[in-house]
């Protein structure tokens, strides 16, 4: 097996190198409005520090946004009051950026003019690293084949469709780690440190909301699970796990709440407008777009895999993990399928969080079963 695992690792490395080679040729000026607004948020952080949470258009006195719009031939680039991705807040008398601050903050960690490439390289390296971790958990040829197919696919997904929005790169990194910890929470042998794991997962999911506001729904399955589990069991451990998840989730979304308070006047007011705040409705065009997209394939795989794990009730904690994933899938699918806008990446976060969780939930108990079997067969020493 060690030679097969080494070969699998080499395959992952080849895909990683291909990613890095492709990413190295990217440009930050590709004519996408969202890109410019995320870069503006990063510029505000680099210029004002944490005060960069205030995205009032009046702070473009250095003409950073205007120059970016000019570079993409935006028709009214000199009039920043017409800037895309900005919303007028009548009560605050401010024109502010609509996005949460997390993506801009992460981009601000890299030098201006060279922010997107290192961010996506980092995202690819994180996926590569956890794919290698999955190799260590593979205990049979079949499980290694699963890891090989999964790892190659997710490393590639770090550039396509992830490159469609800068918010996706940090979101994908969070989904990888949260999926791994979720599997450890429910199916790891002994399930030790459940309180700590619940808190870490809550913090990660909360932090993801700062990258994309829709990532709020990634928490749905966890909240539903902890709530229903407490109603059924009424035990202290379940209550503490749910509370720790909820508290750290709130800590994680604190930057977005603070940004809303500064830009919209209240932590619970939104800076979004237009179609993004439209009432839910079923649109046949949106549904057809999802059915014809790679997102549909990933969601079907996640759904079928969840159903198979639900049937594996003999495996410790597998039903619980499947319930969390199922709850997440249902809530997120309802939201995005009734949202009037389609993009090629909207459901990628829930698909990736679900698939990473299911992968490790499949590998961890199987490796432990093999280990227990080998231990049982060892000769007893006199």
Describe the residue ranges of each PLM region.
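Short acidic/glycine- and proline-prone juxtamembrane loop motifs at membrane-interface regions
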Residues: 160-171, 214, 343-344
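Membrane-lumen/periplasm interface segments of specific transmembrane helices
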Residues: 21, 215-221, 228, 232, ...
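Interfacial juxtamembrane loops and adjacent helix segments
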Residues: 47-102, 107-110
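Hydrophobic, aromatic-rich transmembrane alpha-helices
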Residues: 124-135, 226-232, 294-318, 325, ...
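Membrane-interface alpha helices of multi-pass inner-membrane proteins
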Residues: 195-212, 223, 249-251
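Membrane-interface transmembrane helices that cradle and orient dolichyl/undecaprenyl
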Residues: 138-139, 178-197, 208, 362
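Transmembrane-helix signature of polytopic, membrane-embedded enzymes
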Residues: 132-156, 173, 191-194
């Amino acid at each position: 097996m060690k030679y097969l695992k080494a070969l699998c690792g080499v395959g992952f490395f080849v895909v990683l190198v291909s990613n890095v080679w492709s990413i190295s040729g990217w440009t930050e000026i590709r004519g996408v409005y969202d890109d410019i607004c995320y870069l503006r948020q990063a510029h505000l952080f680099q210029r004002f520090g944490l005060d960069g949470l205030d995205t009032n258009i009046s702070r473009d006195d250095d003409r950073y946004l205007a120059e970016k719009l000019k570079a993409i031939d935006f028709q009214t680039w000199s009039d920043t009051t017409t800037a895309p991705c900005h919303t007028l807040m009548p009560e605050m008398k401010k024109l502010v950026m609509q996005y949460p601050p997390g993506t801009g903050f992460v981009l601000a960690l890299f030098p201006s003019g060279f922010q997107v490439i290192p961010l996506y390289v980092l995202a690819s390296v994180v996926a590569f690293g956890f794919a290698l971790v999955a190799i260590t958990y593979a205990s049979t040829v079949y499980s290694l084949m699963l890891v090989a197919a999964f790892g190659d696919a997710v490393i590639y997904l770090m550039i396509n469709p992830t490159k469609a929005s800068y918010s996706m790169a940090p979101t994908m990194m969070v989904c990888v780690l949260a999926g791994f910890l979720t599997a450890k929470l429910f199916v790891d042998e002994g399930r030790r440190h459940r309180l700590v794991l619940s808190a870490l997962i809550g913090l990660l999911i909360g932090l993801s909301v700062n990258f994309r506001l829709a990532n709020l729904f990634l928490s749905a399955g966890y909240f539903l699970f902890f709530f229903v589990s407490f109603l059924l069991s009424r035990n202290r451990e379940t209550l503490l796990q749910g509370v720790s998840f909820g508290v750290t989730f709130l800590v994680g979304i604190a930057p977005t709440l603070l940004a809303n308070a500064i830009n919209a006047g209240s932590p619970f007011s939104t800076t979004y407008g237009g179609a993004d705040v439209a009432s839910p409705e079923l649109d046949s065009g949106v549904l057809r777009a999802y059915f014809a997209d790679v997102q549909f394939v990933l969601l079907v795989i996640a759904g079928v895999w969840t159903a198979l794990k639900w049937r594996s009730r003999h495996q410790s904690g597998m039903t619980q993990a499947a319930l969390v994933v199922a709850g997440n899938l249902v809530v997120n699918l309802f939201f995005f399928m009734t949202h009037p806008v389609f993009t090629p990446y909207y459901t990628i976060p829930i698909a990736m969080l679900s698939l990473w969780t299911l992968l490790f939930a499949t590998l961890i108990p199987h490796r432990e079963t093999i280990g227990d079997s080998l231990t049982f067969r060892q000769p007893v020493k006199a």
